[in-house]
C-alpha cells in the first residue's frame, strides 16, 4: 500500500517546501488546511473490554484582520464509534460528538525572540448526536498557543480551559470544568519528514482526574497530483486515565490537506 502511494506521489523539493512544512506544524499558520485524524483506543469501561474509534475533522480557516493581525478559526468535529464499554452493549454508540470551536487572534510577526503567539476564546458546542456522546451543555473559556520554530525544531504548547455555562446540565451530567494542555516537540529533516512527540492532557476539575496520552508521530510532507498534504502515523500510550477510560496502547493516523495562500 505504501509503495502504491509513493508511486503516485513525489517528495516535495520546491524552495518553499521548508516553509510549507513549518506552517503545517504551526496551529496558527495563516494557511487553509483540512486535517482528518483517526484515533483508536482500547481497554475501556468497567470490564476493560471496550474500544473507541475517534475521527476528528479539523478545518482551519485564517482571516486577515489588518496589516498586523490574523484571526485563525480551528474547529474540531469528532465522529465517534464505541463498543463494549458497558454490559449488554448499553453504551455501544456511533455518531457525532460535541464540537470544539477555537478562535486565535495572532500577530502576523513573531516576537523579537522568535515566538509565535495566539490567544482567544474556545467554545464547546453540544452537537452530540446521542446523550452518551455529548456533554449536553455549552462551555466557554480561553485558549492560547505559543511556539518557536528554528533549525528544523518546533516546540511549544497549546492550551485551553472550558467552563460549562449550565449549572444543572441535563441527564445528571457533570458540569464541564476542564483544562487541556498540549505541549509538543518535533524535528523536521531535509526530506521534510517530521518526528514528533506530544501529550494531549485533560484535567477534569469536577472529578479531579487526568487523561494523559503520549503520542509518538512520524509525519511526511508530500504532493499528490499537485496537492500538498501531510500523512502521519504513530502509536499512543495512556499514562493516566479515569477508571473507565482508555488504557495501554492505541494508535493514530492522519492526513492533512494543505492550501497555501
Give the ranges of each region predicted by the language model:
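Transmembrane beta-barrel domains of Gram-negative outer membranes and organellar outer membranes
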Residues: 14-261
Amino acid at each position: 500500500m505504501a509503495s502504491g502511494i509513493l508511486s503516485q506521489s513525489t517528495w516535495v523539493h520546491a524552495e518553499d517546501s521548508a516553509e510549507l512544512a513549518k506552517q503545517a506544524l504551526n496551529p496558527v499558520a495563516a494557511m487553509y488546511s483540512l486535517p482528518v485524524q483517526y484515533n483508536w483506543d482500547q481497554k475501556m469501561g468497567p470490564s476493560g473490554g471496550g474500544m473507541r474509534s475517534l475521527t476528528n475533522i479539523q478545518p482551519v480557516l485564517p482571516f486577515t484582520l489588518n496589516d498586523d493581525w490574523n484571526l485563525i478559526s480551528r474547529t474540531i468535529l469528532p465522529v465517534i464509534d464505541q463498543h463494549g464499554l458497558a454490559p449488554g452493549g448499553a453504551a455501544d454508540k456511533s455518531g457525532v460528538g460535541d464540537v470544539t470551536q477555537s478562535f486565535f487572534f495572532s500577530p502576523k510577526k513573531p516576537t523579537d525572540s522568535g515566538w509565535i503567539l495566539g490567544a482567544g476564546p474556545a467554545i464547546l458546542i453540544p452537537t452530540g448526536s446521542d446523550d452518551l456522546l455529548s456533554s449536553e451543555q455549552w462551555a466557554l473559556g480561553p485558549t492560547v498557543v505559543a511556539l518557536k520554530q528554528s533549525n528544523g525544531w518546533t516546540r511549544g504548547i497549546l492550551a485551553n480551559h472550558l467552563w460549562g455555562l449550565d449549572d444543572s446540565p441535563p441527564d445528571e451530567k457533570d458540569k464541564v470544568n476542564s483544562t487541556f494542555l498540549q505541549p509538543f516537540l518535533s524535528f523536521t529533516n531535509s526530506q521534510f519528514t517530521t518526528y514528533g512527540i506530544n501529550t494531549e492532557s485533560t484535567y477534569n476539575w469536577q472529578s479531579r482526574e487526568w487523561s494523559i496520552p503520549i503520542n509518538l508521530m512520524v509525519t511526511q510532507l508530500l504532493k499528490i497530483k499537485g496537492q500538498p498534504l501531510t500523512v502521519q502515523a504513530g502509536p499512543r500510550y495512556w499514562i493516566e486515565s479515569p477508571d473507565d477510560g482508555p488504557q495501554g496502547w492505541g494508535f493514530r493516523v492522519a492526513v492533512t490537506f494543505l492550501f497555501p495562500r
